[in-house]
Amino acid sequence: MKPHFRNPVERMYQDTFSDNFYNRPILSRRNTVWLCYEVKTKGPSRPPLDAKIFRGQVYSKLKYHPEMRFFHWFSKWRKLHRDQEYEVTWYISWSPCTKCTRDVATFLAEDPKVTLTIFVARLYYFWDPDYQEALRSLCQKRDGPRATMKIMNYDEFQHCWSKFVYSQRELFEPWNNLPKYYILLHIMLGEILRHSMDPPTFTSNFNNELWVRGRHETYLCYEVERLHNDTRVLLNQRRGFLCNQAPHKHGFLEGRHAELCFLDVIPFWKLDLHQDYRVTCFTSWSPCFSCAQEMAKFISNNKHVSLCIFAARIYDDQGRCQEGLRTLAKAGAEISIMTYSEFKHCWDTFVDHQGCPFQPWDGLEEHSQALSGRLRAILQNQGN
């Protein structure tokens, strides 16, 4: 008997959307994949030519997956419009499985006039190395057209609610922890796709001038090593960068600091309790008091993880922030100021430098020395 859901539909019920697009990273009993699509010709402000929904079962035959249903429909429709360039957008409850991911990459390679943007509510089998490699192959840009994959944020959920749900003019009501789950998934996807930072973003935010204005974001680059027989083994799959989520960014009312976003994602790494790990963070600002307290709690409760922090600048080194740094150091964290060596390492490791070597800015070493002195005074409780 063939699975149902063969033909596309135009809208879904509110409960169906909320249940299937719920973005908690680990979720069971969601075996139906919902794919909302929009097709339009390339160009600014072009309205969609078609917008409907395909459904399919996760464990059914590949041809019954909604991604394959879409391409079966689109291929027939495309024959009538062979010379036109199209932009396709998917909003999908699960990211495509490994086989669908490879077939999508093949389709796009064979039809360079089609671009695809995929917004996913959740990542399917994100811990599997074969799946990670398939996603990287789909999203790489260097040898031909590929897809762009992003995690659905509040704006995409709101768009789907308005476009594909029988909303009866009711406003979309986000569920609890939607912003937190988005941040977690965004970080995990960045790890998988090995996102890199733009050079201007790095040089602007990590510049270590003693007094800077307008640097309200905190960037945090991280890498993880497993300690074994007095040697360190770098875990390449546990490396990436993130920044704080400012209030109202992506439609979320509340913000979240970069350090807390980082602590949120560590449990999903499933680090072996019987192994010892070293986590190294390179931050544009040292942690604030609250973040330092939370990081201290984390390393106190996770004895198999040691924490090393290199900061480009010291955040508000007066009062409670000084106390927070001392608490963090007392808990066992190593806190240092970034020098030329760390800036170069971050440039080489986390920046899309296109082969250009790191160029230090004027005063880098002098600023590092001055900040190191201030940090030593703080940690020794000597003030300025």
Curated annotation (Swiss-Prot):
GO cellular component term of the entry, any: cytoplasm
GO biological processes: cytidine deamination; cytidine to uridine editing; defense response to virus; DNA cytosine deamination; innate immune response; negative regulation of single stranded viral RNA replication via double stranded DNA intermediate; transposable element silencing
Start and end residues of each stretch annotated as Interaction with DNA: 213-215, 313-320
Catalytic activity: a 2'-deoxycytidine in single-stranded DNA + H2O + H(+) = a 2'-deoxyuridine in single-stranded DNA + NH4(+)
Modified residues (Phosphothreonine): T32, T218
Positions of Zn(2+) 1 binding: H65, C97, C100
This protein's UniProt keywords: Antiviral defense, Cytoplasm, Hydrolase, Immunity, Innate immunity, Metal-binding, Nucleus, Phosphoprotein, Repeat, Zinc
UniProt-annotated binding residues for Zn(2+) 2: H257, C288, C291
Primary site of residence: cytoplasm
Site (Interaction with DNA): N244
Cofactor(s), names only, from the UniProt record: Zn(2+)
Keyword Phosphoprotein among UniProt keywords: yes
Region span, Essential for cytoplasmic localization: 1-60
Region (Necessary for homooligomerization) residue spans: 209-336
Function text: DNA deaminase (cytidine deaminase) which acts as an inhibitor of retrovirus replication and retrotransposon mobility via deaminase-dependent and -independent mechanisms. After the penetration of retroviral nucleocapsids into target cells of infection and the initiation of reverse transcription, it can induce the conversion of cytosine to uracil in the minus-sense single-strand viral DNA, leading to G-to-A hypermutations in the subsequent plus-strand viral DNA.
Quaternary structure annotation from Swiss-Prot or TrEMBL: Homodimer. Homooligomer. Can bind RNA to form ribonucleoprotein complexes of high-molecular-mass (HMM) or low-molecular-mass (LMM). HMM is inactive and heterogeneous in protein composition because of binding nonselectively to cellular RNAs, which in turn are associated with variety of cellular proteins. The LMM form which is enzymatically active has few or no RNAs associated. Its ability to form homooligomer is distinct from its ability to assemble into HMM. Interacts with APOBEC3B, APOBEC3F, MOV10, AGO2, EIF4E, EIF4ENIF1, DCP2 and DDX6 in an RNA-dependent manner.
PANTHER family per record: DNA DC-DU-EDITING ENZYME APOBEC-3G, MRNA EDITING ENZYME
Family to which the UniProt record says this protein belongs: Belongs to the cytidine and deoxycytidylate deaminase family.
Full protein name: DNA dC->dU-editing enzyme APOBEC-3G
Organism the protein comes from: Pan paniscus (Pygmy chimpanzee)
Name of the encoding gene: APOBEC3G
